[in-house]
């Protein structure tokens, strides 16, 4: 006979488990499904929604976390300085995200949702991209040129997001070089004032 002392201890599911499981689903190119996630965690959908919000909020949080991690990794490996290095950081971020197959597939499979999450100025992903762009500029521009106003950062981020994700959603290649050129033109015009 088995006693309770011999039974394995089962870890109770948490919000962090939900986020990890959903991220694995996303990175494997699977559709993040709330019912599948709740079932896998052994919790009800009400509990899952209380932990992570709705599906859009969950995916936005996952992509915001990925954005933050990617900018940190790129910054950790940066070797140059100045405006060229700042834009190289932005370029690497755009190239890596545009080339991330699960993200591209998501954008093409669910275009309206992807655009809300990736391009909307109010999205948590855009907040993380703005922070990453601001950090790249802060780390590479002389102190005399800082801080860069928030509206200039917003223009850089919105132009970049629009020229990156709108083409991907319709099955075209992103225009990263144009986005970088336009962004640099805006920044240099600001710095020349």
Language model regions located:
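Basic, helix-initiating cap at the start of DNA-binding domains
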Residues: 1-40, 56-57, 65
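Solvent-exposed, amphipathic alpha-helical segments
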Residues: 21-28, 69-77, 159-167
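Short hydrophobic/aromatic patch on the recognition helix
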Residues: 42-52
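Charge-biased, low-complexity intrinsically disordered regions
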Residues: 47-48, 82-83, 162
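Hydrophobic alpha-helical connector segments
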Residues: 61, 74-102, 153-156
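Amphipathic alpha-helical segments used for helix-helix packing
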Residues: 97-120
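Amphipathic alpha-helical packing segments from all-alpha helical-bundle domains
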Residues: 114-144, 150-157
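Hydrophobic/aromatic-rich alpha-helical bundle segments in the mid-to-C-terminal region
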Residues: 140-185
